[in-house]
């Protein structure tokens, strides 16, 4: 009832308005953006790998992102910009490593990518465990744990403004290239016609 009053009449207590606008709304919006991004990433992986069970962790992207974030947390800080940048770099490096591993083989089919992804994912998880072992137990270890578990509890309007534009722009770009991505699900003969 108070949210309804806030949206339509603006006849609420200042504390209620502050809690809604500064705590609840940024978390809800971040949950929507995260969910949309994850579902889009999952759909793209399912298209590329011709497998309805495929997800971003199938070629080590999730583990690489976690390792990148953990490295940046231990080296720089646990603030949102360096951590997100570290996660992006880690995910990108894991994809590049998978591509390099597959390039060195005789065949480059879906199974080869998955096996290379398992190798990269295992290596990244080992790196995360080492970083946790050597991390400062007061701050770094907790920050790494919270990052790997995932939580929206620390999202504020400021953090949302940092993250949302990159996420939304990335999703729009992927949707623009939807036709080309869908062509990946076709066989070579079907794609040529």
Q: Where do the model's predicted regions map?
A:
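Alpha-helical transmembrane segments in inner-membrane proteins
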Residues: 1-193
């Amino acid at each position: 009832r108070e949210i309804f009053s806030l949206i339509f009449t603006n006849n609420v207590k200042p504390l209620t308005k502050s809690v809604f606008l500064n705590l609840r709304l940024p978390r809800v919006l971040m949950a929507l953006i995260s969910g949309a991004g994850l579902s889009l990433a999952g759909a793209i992986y399912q298209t590329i790998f011709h497998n309805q069970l495929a997800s971003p962790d199938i070629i080590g992207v999730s583990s690489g992102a976690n390792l990148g974030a953990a490295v940046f947390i231990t080296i720089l800080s646990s603030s949102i910009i360096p951590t997100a940048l570290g996660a992006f770099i880690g995910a990108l490096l894991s994809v590049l490593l998978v591509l390099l591993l597959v390039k060195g083989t005789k065949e480059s089919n879906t199974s080869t990518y998955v096996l290379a992804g398992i190798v990269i994912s295992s290596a990244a998880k080992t790196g995360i465990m080492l970083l946790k072992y050597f991390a400062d137990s007061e701050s770094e270890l907790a920050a790494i744990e919270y990052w790997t578990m995932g939580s929206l509890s620390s999202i504020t309007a400021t953090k949302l403004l940092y993250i949302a534009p990159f996420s939304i722009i990335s999703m729009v770009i992927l949707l623009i290239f939807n036709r080309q991505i869908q062509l990946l699900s076709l066989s070579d003969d079907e794609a040529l016609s």
